[in-house]
């Protein structure tokens, strides 16, 4: 059995550890005792309470591992990934940090490491699917819509998060990049709001976020965009908080103490946005790829609708993100993907039967991507 270290035991990190423990010996490391306790009784999982912001501690934990999963919070994700690579360990990453991860490619090559980044549901599977089709056709347009939402809508936000609010807020303050007529366009996050109908849910609200990430640099496609999905009305609440400075990252003084408004906001929202372990929720995604295939105008549509798993008590967002990650872990361990360097999922999807294997792996866990093809 391989030894795999999962750094981070949040809702997604736990799902990853539990899934991998079916075949491997797993070490789960986190500073939160409450999160680690939920893993203690599971066979093949060892828990370690540790400060993952400490480089020396991380190096010690992963020293004798065969592969590492970086599921640390986004604010420490880049430095954690860098430490893993410097330690010469293969890694699959879902930290989704704001830094440009592609700058670590040379470092990964130097240490002869296979590093797969951003390998969740989106970014992640959305990238892998595009990467695959980009080898089979001339892609002209790529767009996708994605969101994770609670089944029970509670005002004012009608939203719950499986991860830290500060990571969610980061999506709302980071400028959104997309491609229009072959040129990169930058707009504020939360812009270009539109209402879209979905079969299983009804009307949802879509808005710009910076979800294309590596695709901006790696894919030469005329038009590309990504939008986040929420219940209608959510965007107005978020814009109000943003306009009044609640997401401000510059410190302000209150009674002689310096604080960042974003930290206070995140702390206050934890109780309101906390997704309970048994709370019903769903993940929804629609990917549209249009272009020329065998001299014909074609359109591929991938649709995902996944719900909270009542049998395993696992959230849909943890499942769809976590099992995308573990499917990539198996690709590396089984020798299906052996390239050395740092690779976004679009490169993985373009390789051999990697996308097919990732989809099959997730289908075994009842995560099903419905695919349709239309000729114009």
Regions found by a protein language model. Give the residues of each.
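Conserved Rossmann-fold cofactor-binding substructure of NAD(P)-dependent oxidoreductases
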Residues: 52-64
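Beta-loop-alpha module in the N-terminal Rossmann-like domain of NAD(P)-dependent dehydrogenases
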Residues: 67-84, 97-101
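Rossmann-fold cofactor-recognition segment
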Residues: 43-54
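C-terminal catalytic/substrate-binding lobe primarily of soluble NAD(P)-dependent oxidoreductases
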Residues: 135-376
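Conserved N-terminal Rossmann-fold NAD(P)-binding element of oxidoreductases
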Residues: 4-8
